[in-house]
């Protein structure tokens, strides 16, 4: 059942009053090179892009912090960057957005992740990735855990944003979960399909997309299971999650809350126009976690996250959703449902 306008407004209005959320994850930059193709190269059968615009945007877990900022939620970003010019750019972009850099750890053995998308108005031509996927070393792990331990004293919850770039391990994930659950604080996980599911055991909220959910339960030995309710129940039973949300793209979101009736609920998608899905999952986890911390039920939080994702998929590239856009989107959605 869709929320009332007053309830939705109340949840979103509470965002600015929340204590900061810690975001731990793989960090990087999304670069967009935009232009027009008018000819094919004489050197090879490839298009020639005449560049008209370029811009850099906070990406990966940094996009989660950027989305929290856009929703008027305070956060601290914690992760590893290289000792290179792109690491300086990460810090510059964070400072430009009014986000602190206290949680960044530099590692000269790593390359700062940088993803360049070459695109026209109608299609993406290619993507160029610069990154290191090797596991962080023991010294870097020790430094990360120390920062997280310190931040847990002043933060209301944590989002684990795993992009499979080498930051996370079972040791780090379980340490984060233990630190925050000892203080009865929310631990939300946006998983990587390449990481073993056991890494995330015991988290409060687990938010895979549908493809990730299938890959994860197959990794657990359930190769033929396709029923969403059964999948959600396997996740909460075997991995001891309190809440599960599976994002379904055009079909909305499926959720199961062990603190509720324990039955699967599905809400329809809030997106009525899709231009680019880049970063929509980051927006959703930011909005859902903020809503739960604001006292929303899982279903209410899912509606907020659903609408926030609906805002950003209408925009080009890694995009943000403001509080004003979120409220307006929900108002329009209610009118459509009526």
Explain the meaning of each model-derived region.
Residues 21-23, 187, 206, 244:
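Residue-level marker for buried hydrophobic side chains located in beta-strands
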Residues 31-34:
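Extended acidic/charged loop-beta regions that coordinate divalent cations
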Residues 2-9, 14, 20-21, 42, ...:
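Substrate-binding N-lobe of the ribokinase-like
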Residues 27, 163, 283:
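Active-site metal-binding loops of divalent metal-dependent hydrolases
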Residues 3-11, 135, 154, 171-186, ...:
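Conserved phosphate-binding/catalytic region of the ribokinase-like
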Residues 37-46, 115-130, 134-136, 142-144, ...:
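Conserved beta-alpha-beta core of the PfkB/ribokinase-like small-molecule kinase fold
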Residues 69-76, 153-159, 179, 239:
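Short, surface-exposed connector motifs at secondary-structure boundaries
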Residues 18-29:
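Acidic-leg catalytic submotif of subtilisin-like serine proteases
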């Amino acid at each position: 059942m869709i929320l009332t306008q007053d309830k939705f407004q109340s949840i979103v209005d509470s965002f600015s009053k929340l204590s900061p959320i810690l975001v731990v994850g793989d960090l990087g930059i999304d670069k967009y090179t935009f232009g027009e193709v008018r000819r094919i190269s004489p050197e090879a059968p490839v298009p020639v892009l005449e560049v008209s615009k370029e811009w850099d945007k906070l990406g990966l877990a940094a996009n989660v912090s950027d989305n929290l900022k856009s929703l008027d939620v305070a956060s601290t970003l914690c992760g590893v960057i290289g000792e290179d010019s792109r690491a300086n750019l990460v810090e510059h972009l964070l400072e430009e957005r009014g986000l602190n850099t206290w949680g960044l750890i530099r590692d000269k053995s790593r390359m700062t992740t940088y993803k360049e998308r070459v695109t026209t108005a109608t299609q993406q031509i290619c993507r160029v990735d610069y990154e290191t996927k090797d596991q962080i070393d023991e010294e870097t792990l020790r430094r990360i855990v120390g920062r997280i331990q310190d931040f847990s004293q002043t933060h209301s919850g944590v989002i684990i944003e795993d992009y499979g770039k080498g930051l996370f391990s079972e040791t780090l994930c379980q340490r984060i979960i233990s630190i925050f659950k000892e203080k009865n604080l929310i631990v939300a996980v946006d998983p990587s399909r390449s990481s073993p599911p056991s890494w995330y055991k015991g988290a409060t909220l687990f938010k895979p997309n549908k493809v990730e959910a299938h890959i994860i339960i197959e990794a657990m030995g359930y190769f033929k299971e396709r029923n969403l309710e059964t999948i959600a129940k396997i996740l909460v039973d075997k991995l001891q999650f309190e809440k599960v949300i599976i994002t379904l793209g055009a079909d909305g979101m499926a959720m199961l809350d062990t603190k509720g009736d324990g039955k699967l609920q599905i809400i329809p998608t809030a997106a009525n126009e899709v231009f680019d899905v880049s970063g929509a999952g980051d927006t959703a986890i930011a909005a859902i976690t903020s809503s739960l911390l604001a006292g929303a039920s899982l279903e209410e939080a899912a509606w907020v996250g659903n609408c926030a994702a609906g805002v950003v998929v209408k925009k080009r590239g890694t995009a943000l959703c403001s509080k004003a856009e979120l409220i307006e989107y929900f108002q329009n959605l209610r009118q459509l449902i009526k």
